[in-house]
Amino acid sequence: LKLAKNVIFTGMITPEEVGRYYQAGDLFVSASTSETQGMTYAEALAGGIPLLCRRDGCLEQVVTDGENGWQYDEKEDYLMRIQEWKGMGENARSRMQNKAAISAEKFSSGNFAERVEKIYEQQIRKYRYENAA
């Protein structure tokens, strides 16, 4: 793929610098076989960076293939998606970047708080129903 001239291994960077590094990229690529929190995916999306990552059940609600990125299963899928990205016109890339940024909104602290609040409300209702006299 001749990507070596376009890939930079930075080593450790401070948390304050993270956003600048995401903005320097065009596509977030991950070959991770397991994720515990998936913060890197949310951070990349928040910066409008589409994702290319190994298929993982925890990412089903994160990556919408062809919209805000892709998931791949095998090396061939990965290579195909890289070629697809490289061949995309500026308008198509821009649309995908916009969709990436929009999809990150579900990871905002406000949305997280709303989801947690709903869970608590459901559990309170369930408790009251089960313990009604």
Language-model segments: residues:
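Short alpha-helical donor nucleotide-sugar binding micro-motif in glycosyltransferases
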Residues: 12-13, 20-25
